[in-house]
Amino acid sequence: MAYTNSPLVKYTKLSPNHSGKRTHSIDRITPHCVVGQLSAESICACFPAGRGASCNYGIGYDGKISLCVEEKNRSWCSSSPANDQRAITIECASDKTHPYAMNSNVYKSLVNLCVDICKRNGKRKLLWLGDKNKTLSYIPKSDEMVLTVHRWFAN
């Protein structure tokens, strides 16, 4: 499969923190709260060499989207190598305290980015199953993408 990156990206700073080419096709999207009202640029700056973490995209507090790891490569985001091999991972600016709310700019950009990812990967449905075991055992059909969440994989 030929991988492409989102045309919605307004800033690129590629992190060296990734495992190279994916070993699984993209059939998951894993958003995550970055726990701070960071800019798109600041999100990419969180992943210098040696940090041991990264994401494919970041969405800043103003809704601006950044590219941190190209879609063709597996990021180090969800605490699960198996999930990261098949997921586009997205760090989203959020409040620092529970419930880690995203503002409307971030949420709108997240929805637009998810639509773009699905379209570019030939997916017509984005599924939220809401249950860890159900989601992780689900085998997506060729036109489906599944949402996963970081807390399902975190230590």
Predicted regions and their residues:
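Short C-terminal domain-edge/linker segments immediately following a structured domain
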Residues: 59-64, 87-89, 119-124
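Basic/polar, cationic surfaces and motifs that engage anionic cell-wall
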Residues: 1-12, 18-23, 96-155
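Structural preference for beta-strand elements that scaffold enzyme active sites
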Residues: 28, 87-89, 146-148
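Cell-envelope and extracellular/periplasmic
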Residues: 35, 71, 81-99, 115-119, ...
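N-terminal catalytic cores of peptidoglycan-degrading enzymes
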Residues: 1-84
